[in-house]
Amino acid sequence: MKLKRMRFPLALLSVLFAGSCFHAAFAAPTFWSSVGPDGGDARRFAFDPHDPSRIYLGTTDSWIYVSNDGGSSWSRLAELPSREHLVIDSLVVDREDPSTLYAGVYVMDQTDGGVFISHDRGRTWTPAEGMRGQSVFALVQAASAPNTFVAGTLKGVYRSDDKGLHWREISPPGSREVHEVQSIAIDPNDANTIYAGTWHLPWKTTDNGAHWNGIKDGLIDDSDVFSMVIDRTRPTIMFLSACSGIYKTDSAGQLFHKVQGIPSTARRTRVLMMDPKDPNTVYAGTTEGLYKTQDGGTVWSRTTGPDLIVNDVYIDPRNPRHVLLATDRSGVLASESAGAGFISSNTGFSQRQVAALLADNSHEGTIYAGVINDKTYGGVFVTKDFGRTWKQRSEGLDGRDVFELAQTSDGTLLAGTSDGVYRWNGGVWTRDDSVTGPVTVPVAPAHTRSSRTRESAQMRQAELRRAEEERAAAHRVHVSAIQGHVTALVVMGDAVYAATAQGLFRSMNHGVSWQGPMLGASTPGVFAGAGSYYAVAGEGETIFAGRRQGIVMSENHGATWKSVSFPTGLTALHTLAVAPDGSLWVGGREGVYTSTDHGLTWTRFDKLPVTDITSLAWNNKLQRMVLTSGQDSLIFAVDPADKTWKWWNPGWMVHSVAALQGRLVAASMFSGVVVQPQPEQASLSLNSGGGQSAQR
């Protein structure tokens, strides 16, 4: 079985995850507040056995949350050290000492992870030395021997008998069978009897790993075993879930039989959970909702909609009617009716992947966030009180990812999605992106300095333009609607420009209809390189549009275009912007480049201590060019006149920044919208990097 997660587009990820080793002169982060939107991916629960209302929640991005009110509200507790993007698929609270917690983690699509231990109720964590670098998919504490922990990893099965201080492999080293261990179960009466669910059938040992036996009678061959649960009162009874369905054994694994009642489309059951007071009641969290049996597996019924992906189930041991679900996309759901109905319970929990951030032009404190990878649980969210409360505003988007947000001159909201441009009409998003007609325009060669006279250069360009018009006429692209990924929406006066996988489009009526493609994804001629347009920027009549390795320019609102010389040394363009003084800024893999002559010459901004630029945007309130980098969590604000800069370290990897009510807000990769704790002070101190620190 290959584990994957949905991610940002590859081009964006290659920038955002470039690394985080950075200059020591920069201050340690003071984490800005994550204010939502609430929800996102929730992975794993654990609760204090002495106080079940204290619940811990693991995520896919190294963070652990805690609730002290049974899951009604959440707060960030700690980020696991060592590296980012750890998937916390195992959380254990020590039954003897609830101040001690254990986390089993891995990195998606990589061989990395380990076991982390906390002795202060989850506030600080240290890695267990014997498990460094292990992809840990399962971690269980033995009920009959509290000092004993068993971990299932990519390599095999590991055991500790001193509460995680030392570990040893108890599966055959280098085994081609007992490896890729996704789930672990331990006999509640015998810590030497261990079940290991692998990506290719389950295994069992009754002598602490000295011998292992495959237990596959009754199972479909090559079944990935995701979860196993043992009846605490009758340990011979066990349920396991596999990609081929749910199975039950009454003989401690000697023979399994497949349970009926769960459709084949929902057979990827990620978790099985038994009611602590009634072992005949079992919950099955699947990729198509929550199922439940109350008669030991004979009859199953679905208690949620089929669009829910359930990762974990919490059942209150004091009151089994209180049930929580950890889900993909929709975060935490709560039921007070033993799963008969659920409501969102995400206050304080935000693991959203925010791709677009927009501050309302007219309403101070109003922020829009465009979310990706959350299907119908995502889309667009709005807050009118600076992030204290959010409302989903996604009607009509039908689960599409939102990569761009813009507000036209009359206040109309536009959303650039994974499939076209949508316009908000006050109650629903409508796809008013019909294209009125093809517009294929000539592109002249890149202009460079030459000893020729201006007149001769203009004559040569005119000849090339006429020849290009003749070739272009045969290649006009007819598009009925904007389709595919919209990478940028830029408002310039009454015009809106959309950079898309099909090319560049323009609207002159606030997004009701569009003209284009002005430049197609395969525009013929002297502009080398076909493909998507990723960035658009401009000032006045001048517009720039960028591909990964090319820039074009129009000085007449897009009527005609010419190619601009590409910065020497830049291998991939990610973003571009224009300052009020007309200077062109380009950000990419090798850093920031600027031009004051429309791309005739370029200067690399080599004093800036970062490369891999993810965003560039002029900020009117700061009167500076604000940029972010995939190298680290720093935000820079550069004065275009003298190239001095100040910086902030919000503690999050961000890729879009806005100023609102005297504070900065930013879109983070997996933690929603983050906001400065309070307004920045006017006084600034010089840092060793040649810029000014805005850190407090």
Where are these predicted regions, by residue range?
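Extracellular glycan-interacting surfaces
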Residues: 4, 8, 13, 17, ...
